[in-house]
A protein has these predicted regions:
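A glycine- and small-aliphatic-rich helix-loop capping segment at beta-alpha/alpha-beta transitions
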Residues: 54-65, 89, 164-173
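Glycine-rich beta-strand-to-loop/alpha-helix junction loops that act as flexible
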Residues: 42-47, 151-155, 208
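Short, conserved loop/helix-junction motifs that constitute active-site signature segments
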Residues: 61-70, 99-101, 168-170, 195-200, ...
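N-terminal glycine-/serine-/threonine-rich phosphate-binding loop
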Residues: 1-40, 121
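ATP/nucleoside-binding phosphotransfer catalytic cores, i.e., glycine-rich phosphate-binding loops
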Residues: 195, 201-261
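Ligand-binding beta-strand-loop-alpha-helix segment within the catalytic cores
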Residues: 2-4, 64-147
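Glycine-rich N-terminal segment of FAD-binding domains in flavoprotein oxidoreductases
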Residues: 29-59
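Class I SAM-dependent methyltransferase SAM-binding "motif I" and its flanking Rossmann-like core
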Residues: 148-195
């Protein structure tokens, strides 16, 4: 497990999104070259969608073999299919509809008007089963080997739909949970848990804007994961925080090299 996070601070959110998109393209191409395919977990929110839009606008996107890419989600708002607030709907608009993905490899979380109806626990269990089916049986794993897992960091330090002091952030067994009573609407969601997040080779946390500065400082200053879920998001090989200058404004400059600014 990568316990020491790496920080990269960019001038503004636009540059951060472009740089993150370039990093992701390189990571996907490298994974496809070495293993034949790549697996990425997407995040929603303004920074996650900004990265996808930057990727869509990048000429280098054509280096990716989109037919050999598995896409998963870290969390989802439990709303009807096609609802504009669903992360998958926003991802399709930002990028997915513009690239030749294999539909069988786009693993959206269930919607509230799907086969499980409004039973969010059944929806979470179904997604956990889908993850398990895609896992390598020889590794006795319950989730696939994610090359990169993307997470946005909320102003309250939440990641995915794991909120401070809520039951979900305390989960230690299940890979996917139904979330009830989210402090951020809508109240019902599906989310990966910290144990699932920590199986990823690399976890990238995205934060931009002055409203994220306190959360970033809290998560990187030794806060516990129950109080600051972002502090508990770590990759097996690498944990990378991609920030803009505003989000990094409460960090001591000794935490990141001047060249990264």
């Amino acid at each position: 497990m990568s316990d020491t996070p790496q920080l990269v601070v960019h001038r503004d959110k636009e540059l951060m999104a472009e740089a993150a998109a370039a990093r992701l393209i390189t990571k996907i191409v490298d994974a496809q070259s070495s293993r034949g395919s790549a697996s990425v977990v997407l995040t929603g929110g303004r920074n996650g969608n900004g990265l996808l839009a930057a990727l869509a606008a990048s000429p280098a996107r054509d280096a990716v073999d989109w037919s050999r890419l598995d896409l998963w989600w870290g969390d989802e708002r439990f709303l009807p299919e096609g609802d504009p607030e669903r992360n998958v709907t926003q991802a399709r608009e930002a990028l997915l509809d513009a690239v030749p993905l294999d539909p069988e490899r786009v693993h959206a979380m269930p919607a509230s008007d799907g086969p499980y109806g409004t039973d969010v626990e059944a929806a979470a269990a179904a997604y956990a089963e889908e993850l398990a089916k895609a896992a390598a049986p020889e590794n006795h794993a319950t989730v696939p080997s994610f090359d990169v897992l993307l997470l946005g960091v909320g102003p309250d330090t939440h990641v995915a739909s794991l909120f401070p002091e809520h039951p979900g952030v305390r989960e230690t067994e299940r890979m996917v949970i139904g979330v009830h009573g989210s402090p951020k609407p809508p109240p019902t969601r599906v989310s990966l848990t910290l144990p699932a997040i920590r199986t990823a080779r690399e976890v990238w946390l995205l934060a931009a804007g002055e409203d994220k500065a306190n959360a970033v400082a809290m998560a990187l200053s030794g806060a516990g994961e129950i109080q600051a879920p972002a502090a508990g998001a770590r990759g097996r090989a690498r944990t990378l925080w991609l920030l803009d200058a505003a989000a990094a404004s409460q960090l001591p400059r000794t935490m990141y090299p001047p060249a990264s600014a």
